[in-house]
């Protein structure tokens, strides 16, 4: 069944000569793996393979089956272009750190809308912010991620650092 969802690319791994296996944190299904055949051929333009770079915000049409470990993507397009993340090396590395931390933290394919919207917002803020303020994002993301996973600091009267 074809379903429409938004997703954040966490990682892409080459598979065979022309394919990619992409881990995507989706709005509706949580962490999912998708195989994209023929994306790395010479006939395809480079823009198609660049869609699946980590920290890309995509709108996806996917063939979703609950029982399968790896599904297929019918169509993918960016719904928010993050130019600054791809051009600035510092911001790119910060985004890669956050995507890797998120990938290592998510183990089950379950939807987590607040976490998805938090990640989407923090990537947009990192993209729109200046380079000097970018150094705060890894700490901010690391401190707030546990809250969305169910074991964060919840006491308002205690500070994080005493």
Feature map (PLM): residue ranges:
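Non-catalytic alpha-helical scaffolds and adjoining flexible linkers that form interface surfaces
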Residues: 1-19, 25-162
């Amino acid at each position: 069944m074809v379903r429409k969802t938004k997703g954040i690319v966490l990682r892409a791994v080459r598979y065979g000569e022309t394919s990619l296996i992409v881990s995507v944190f989706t709005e509706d299904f949580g962490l999912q793996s998708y195989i994209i055949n023929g994306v790395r051929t010479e006939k395809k333009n480079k823009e198609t393979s660049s869609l699946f770079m980590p920290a890309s915000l995509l709108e996806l049409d996917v063939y979703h089956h609950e029982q399968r470990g790896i599904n297929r993507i019918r169509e993918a397009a960016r719904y928010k272009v993050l130019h600054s993340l791809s051009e600035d090396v510092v911001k790119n590395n910060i985004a890669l750190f956050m995507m890797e931390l998120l990938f290592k933290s998510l183990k089950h394919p379950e939807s987590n809308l607040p976490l998805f919207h938090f990640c989407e917002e923090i990537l947009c803020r990192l993209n729109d912010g200046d380079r000097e303020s970018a150094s705060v994002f890894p700490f901010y993301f690391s401190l707030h991620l546990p809250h969305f996973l169910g074991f964060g600091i919840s006491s308002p009267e205690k500070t994080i650092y005493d």
